[in-house]
A protein has these predicted regions:
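Short, basic/glycine-rich phosphate-binding loops at helix/coil junctions
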Residues: 55-71, 120, 125
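PIN-domain endoribonuclease scaffold, especially VapC-family toxins
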Residues: 110-111, 117, 121
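A general structural motif
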Residues: 7-9, 95, 123
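Residue-level detector of short coil/turn "hinge" positions at structural boundaries
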Residues: 38-41, 98, 123
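Substrate-recognition element of Asp-dependent hydrolases with the DxDx(T/V) motif
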Residues: 75-79, 84-113, 127-129
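Active-site neighborhood of HAD-like aspartate-dependent phosphohydrolases
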Residues: 3-64
Length: 130
């Protein structure tokens, strides 16, 4: 006997930062460029460590800096992880629905939408949370 297994269409929720977009490299590279201090990814062991690893006294100071870097937020020019876009495109071409779910500050939504378009992320549905 020969059996064929057909996978049904999946609805896949995908986060951006740390999954598709390399937020850590983005902010540490920009921080080194702006302030001359290199922060290794090995120094970052959990979320929210920007304050002790940088000169910023409060977390809000970090986000105020990240809000306007040469006229755009830190989220505008993040690099993607290797093969992340290709995997999403492949899943989409196979009939699966890609839903973007991302926690973002309100001021970064425009830049994030531009980033999604420029990187041709195959999604028709996007949810932002804070």
């Amino acid at each position: 006997m020969h059996y064929t297994i057909k996978l049904s269409q999946m609805r896949i929720g995908v986060d951006l930062d740390g999954v598709v977009a390399d937020f850590t490299d983005g902010w540490t590279s920009q921080y080194e460029k702006d302030f001359g201090k290199k922060i290794s990814e090995n120094d970052i062991t959990e979320w929210g460590l920007a304050k002790p690893l940088t000169h910023f006294e409060e977390e809000v100071d970090f986000w105020n800096w990240a809000k306007d870097i040469d006229g755009a937020s830190i989220f505008r020019n993040l690099k993607t992880y290797n093969n992340a876009i290709e995997v999403l495109v492949d899943l989409s071409l196979k009939g699966h629905e890609i839903v973007i779910i991302s926690s973002k500050p309100w001021w970064s939504i425009h830049d994030t939408l531009m980033w999604l378009g420029e990187n041709k992320i195959p999604s028709k549905e996007i949810h932002f949370t804070e």
